[in-house]
């Protein structure tokens, strides 16, 4: 018998001679199939069913020889089965014996006497055999009844065969899991169908019942409100009538004094006139007394209302969102200081210094060199301020002024004539806001259909939806809405849906053919985000299946030819965007600190350049906040020496109302500087921008599949991004772009385009989503740029380890449930495992807090010690996950107070977002059939549930520090962790990031035995042994004689 390695080499050699090719996985497949077959003909038939081999001639001989060479396990019969088989044979043998008939009584007596003793001896054995036979018959009847129930009365037996090997058992479990998965998917679809209200089907009985119920509730509420409304209306009427009567009385007295002032009146007329004057005076005194009482009431102390025993409610102080926590205290201090400071009036204006002067020293300025000019298509004109433009033009005039408006009819004709259309237009041409409106006006939303427009960023989806709703004159959330992760601002009437590309991907789960959409517009396609690339492949297939679906791919002036080729040579429709020329300036020498150079350049432009707003591109939230603080500090020190400079940040985690400030008109006499991430390159259009500052850097996420480590590093941007940034300056007038790097660096150090995100990120969520959609052949999926093989393989391995995929790569029931949760697969597994450990409420809180991207605590520079002490007060034994749970629990107990957040140095906006995430995840628990339960303070169960999801991320303490269990990579605990000084032996981490070191963030102390409990398929007991914990045997020393 050949060895496995030798057999595999033999199969590869034979495959090469028979088929002309050889591959290791094919050889292993053939050997495994031959081992599972019981005969050579069955093996040949299985190969023929695959439709990959022509089993005639040499191929058939090869299959027969392979079957004869493959070793097979001999079926070993269990002792209990052997004893049972012998008992059955003996029973059949006894039944074959018959007594012979004889007329002689003596012979009968002899036989009876001789056999009496033998019958007594065998009596017990016969009774035992009879009992065993009855039990076997009962077991066979029960097995047949179960088989009839499962197969609907068919003759197929569900009894496990005697010779069932490991492969057959695994196959049976796989088929059973597939049935459960399909049943779960059907239940989810049925629930969605029951909860979906179809406004077009007026005959729906359930809809009628719901409408009647709502009308009845409204009627009851109206009846309950009528008495109070009558009282309120009566009071308002009496007050109004009092004013009218008093005015009539005063007018009547004035007329009488004017007409009969010099006429002798009778005694009755004099008394009547005196009475009217008395009434008028009393009415005036009554009104004055009422006003005086109101004035005193405002300065009077009022006893607070009793609130004990009432449930705490969520309070959102919208008026305090405009700044950091403690904004109200800061405003009060500024008001008091302002009242105490000395101010000059017009009388002292002559004695003051000139209003403006040069505030930068010559050595502080940055020298720029004008290199090129981006040509525009309109003549320069005097740029009107935003306030003047808003006063002179209406919204419709602004729409008509956009570059896309002259091409409206041609664009609609091209959309009608082609199913897929590539639209090329620079940011600001109006393609994002106007094209969906044109389609709406053209009737593409008739018959209940909708139009989807995807955006790569949630900030862009929210701001664009608000702008379109304002232009259409509708309320946001009605006809126009947006849908982003953990926030849905749509309704049943929404026909224009702006959403992130990830949200449209999730809609494929419930509606794989996008039947409710007539047009799908993929905007900002040139950014090539992960979800955008996946959408390309899916929408391409859906478009072939639905000829009536219109697909629009909107991009800037990059990669349009490539998009056209991908979509089967789709036509390209070009829209001009830049309307004015842009001068580009480079520095003479490289800048060492580009953040400091940005601040200096902003002040230099503000002092030396004509009016016009400034746009600064930085890499992330930390740099933006630092730059804004530096600018505000320097402007505060300069005081009245410079004009007013409004510093406005814009990044993804900023609240919506603060994001909307960048779109507000700049006040007269001031200048606005917008400090933004690369979101302002293409996703947003800010009016009034004349100057652009480009340091030439951006943040990119990279992923190492070998270590599973992600890193968000600052890297030079591409030439395409630099050109996009420069184009922001030519929207309203001739602009200028100041690049804080040299022209040589632009030509030789910048890449042409940015690497697509799909080639530098983890693919766990994408693989799970595609598997949920029934796409199993991921290697041949129609990617615009295929991801690296190692990254895809690692994603499959992780999903298999989490139980989302079986050994054949098919989606399991757990995987189908995990796909319903809009979080990372490990986080989804943790939530599903919480049901087993009865701690789903605590796990939901932990999952929500982990989803806010490490932005819970903040450390003001002037209160670092206080912030660190406040953070330490939340520490609990066990790890950072329990710290996050403690923070949220105390915040909830405080009534979701913003003041509590300020006192404990916790970011209120992040906590409010965590609350929104938790509410959505709690609503999805019913969808994935997980019940709500609490551990009642037993945090061991919480830690075990977290381990069930993140057992892939474990590390243990060795003599050289922490190392990951599987990869043996050296890692470090983050200094902000609660376990930084404790150094436990076994750790679990949420993510591994590369900054200055390989840091583990959000670590949790675990026990090694838990890994065997939650993931016995992934860890072996030998891997979890501590080699340093073993004690070596004591050695007995030798004497001098023994040593020789």
Curated annotation (Swiss-Prot):
Localisation: Nucleus; Nucleus, Nucleoplasm; Cytoplasm
GO MF annotation list: ATP binding; ATP hydrolysis activity; helicase activity; RNA binding; RNA helicase activity
Residue numbers spanned by region Disordered: 101-210, 374-394
Signal sequence range: none
Sequence ranges assigned to domain Helicase ATP-binding in this UniProt record: 412-576
Acidic residues composition bias: residue spans: 134-143
UniProt family annotation: Belongs to the DEAD box helicase family. DEAH subfamily. DDX16/PRP8 sub-subfamily.
GO term, biological process aspect, one: mRNA splicing, via spliceosome
Gene: DHX16
Feature: compositional bias, Basic and acidic residues: 169-210
GO CC term (a single one): nucleoplasm
PROSITE patterns registered for this protein in UniProt: DEAH_ATP_HELICASE, HELICASE_ATP_BIND_1, HELICASE_CTER
Residues with PTM Phosphoserine: 103, 106-107, 163
Keywords (A to Z) from UniProt: ATP-binding, Cytoplasm, Helicase, Hydrolase, Immunity, Innate immunity, mRNA processing, mRNA splicing, Nucleotide-binding, Nucleus, Phosphoprotein, Spliceosome
Helicase C-terminal domain ranges (all copies): 601-774
TM segment ranges: none
Residues given in the record as ATP binding sites: 425-432
SUPFAM superfamilies xref list: P-loop containing nucleoside triphosphate hydrolases
Modified residues (Phosphothreonine): 715
Job description of the protein: Required for pre-mRNA splicing as a component of the spliceosome. Contributes to pre-mRNA splicing after spliceosome formation and prior to the first transesterification reaction. As a component of the minor spliceosome, involved in the splicing of U12-type introns in pre-mRNAs. Also plays a role in innate antiviral response by acting as a pattern recognition receptor sensing splicing signals in viral RNA.
Documented EC number(s): 3.6.4.13
Residue stretches of biased makeup (Basic residues): 119-130
Substrates-to-products reaction catalysed: ATP + H2O = ADP + phosphate + H(+)
Name the record gives this protein: Pre-mRNA-splicing factor ATP-dependent RNA helicase DHX16
Any Pfam family hit: Helicase_C
Residue window of motif DEAH box: 523-526
